[in-house]
Curated annotation (Swiss-Prot):
Domain of life: Bacteria
Organism: Bacillus subtilis (strain 168)
Coiled-coil annotated spans: 34-71
One annotated GO biological process: regulation of cell shape
Any one cellular-component term (Gene Ontology): cytoplasm
UniProt-annotated location(s): Cytoplasm
Protein name, entry field: Cell cycle protein GpsB
Pfam families, A to Z: DivIVA (PF05103)
Amino acid sequence: MLADKVKLSAKEILEKEFKTGVRGYKQEDVDKFLDMIIKDYETFHQEIEELQQENLQLKKQLEEASKKQPVQSNTTNFDILKRLSNLEKHVFGSKLYD
């Protein structure tokens, strides 16, 4: 997937040879610059791999979560009030109704 979009690999950059002219660039400067580019490419590649793995993991988690039964939300206000009333009777007993 990513290989289709990226034109150069770190290895290709490393192995690239430049022709020198009469007053060409300093080879040492070119090598240093290419080394920086290679390090960046390797860092980007590693980051992309990690993000793709995380993306797959999150998609699986989402799929699993959507397959699970939804939490029962059948508890209505009436049920809550009924439970509350029973708890009050149990805690306060007959004091509540005196």
